[in-house]
Amino acid sequence: MFTSNTDDDRGQVGIGTLIVFIAMVLVAAIAAGVLINTAGMLQTQAEATGEESTDQVSDRLEISSTSGDFSDVNTLGAGEGEELEVTVEAGDATAAGEEVVIRVATSAESGFEDSKAIELPDEAGDPTTVTLDNLPSIGGALVTVDGENVQAVTEDSVDLTQGDPSVSFNVDELSDDSESTIGLQLTADAGNNFWDEIAEDNIEDTVTVQLTDYERTEAEITNVNNWGSDDAEIEWEATVPADEGDYAVEVIGFDSARMLPISTNEVASTTEDPELGETDTQIDNLQFSVATAPGSDAIDLEETSVQFIGDQGEETVTITDRNVENIQGVDGNVLTDNSDRALVSFDPVADIDGFNRIEESEDLTVIFTTASGASTETELRIPSTFLEGDESVRL
């Protein structure tokens, strides 16, 4: 009635079942590996995101103060819309890679893009070409290329009234950086009543003389002769940090543009029959005193971008060596300590593409963004009036 089992009657595992079992084990192992890898990847991403977020919070600039330098500009209503193509190349290896400023002498006519800052290619002989837009219609324009470490060169016969005007420059390094002077002597025509319209002690607030050099240096009155007579004379003098170079002198305040070519250690003389013109006061230099935020790592200012948003549009620029001045502790334009201070300056016309000088009552938002992506924003409120006698204003 009972049947005994033998070895031949034991249960057998089929090959198919064994394959399925092994496959399930492999799938489980692979799944475990994927989970481990995914967890590791997520952890790495989380750590990177955390570090990036920390950098964006900590590697940030602080702006301790903002200000603007202002000067008089002519509002002559001259013809506009001319373009000029300017090509510049370094004549030798020492001038290669230098930053230069191209300036067209316009007697500081308001609204014109008369300046542009560029960096020369790193190889001597390699040209770089830029276009200056919206220039006045001048038959014999004076165009200057100058840099902190290059010799100034001026072309004095550029006709902006002809189709597609262009000019080329070859610049060399300064051979001597000792200071020199440039002067202007202005004499009124006999019988002209120009000098009767202004007081002798108010000349400097009425007529301004400046150069087309790297920093657009403003000249100072050094002598006044025969005031009130038919041959009254005013003498101006400016100091430039080089003993060689050619520039243009611009006179601001007359009813028409006055520009003269001049070389260092020379005095230009002109006899005029001037009438007072319309002038305005506008900001031609924006300045920001910056430091690192507490806990920040070192910040390279030359890897920092600055966005300008205002009535004139929106434009982003990258800080260059030309824009940075060391106030305290800054080495190589890098802020390494919270006590380091730098002054970052911008010429609105030369440095910000499409911008002109900043007018009264303009609003401007400025955003500094470091290499880590950390941003610092400041709002500039331009006063509705500038106090007479002042040369700068806090913004």
UniProtKB/Swiss-Prot annotation:
* GO terms under biological process: archaeal or bacterial-type flagellum-dependent cell motility
Disulfide bond residue pairs: none
- Specify the protein name: Flagellin B3
Give the protein family: Belongs to the archaeal flagellin family.
Q: What does this protein do?
A: Flagellin is the subunit protein which polymerizes to form the filaments of archaeal flagella.
Instruction: State the organism named in the record.
Output: Natrialba magadii (strain ATCC 43099 / DSM 3394 / CCM 3739 / CIP 104546 / IAM 13178 / JCM 8861 / NBRC 102185 / NCIMB 2190 / MS3)
Q: Which Pfam family, any one, appears in the UniProt record?
A: Arch_flagellin
Domain of life of the organism encoding this protein: Archaea
- Residues forming the propeptide are 1-11
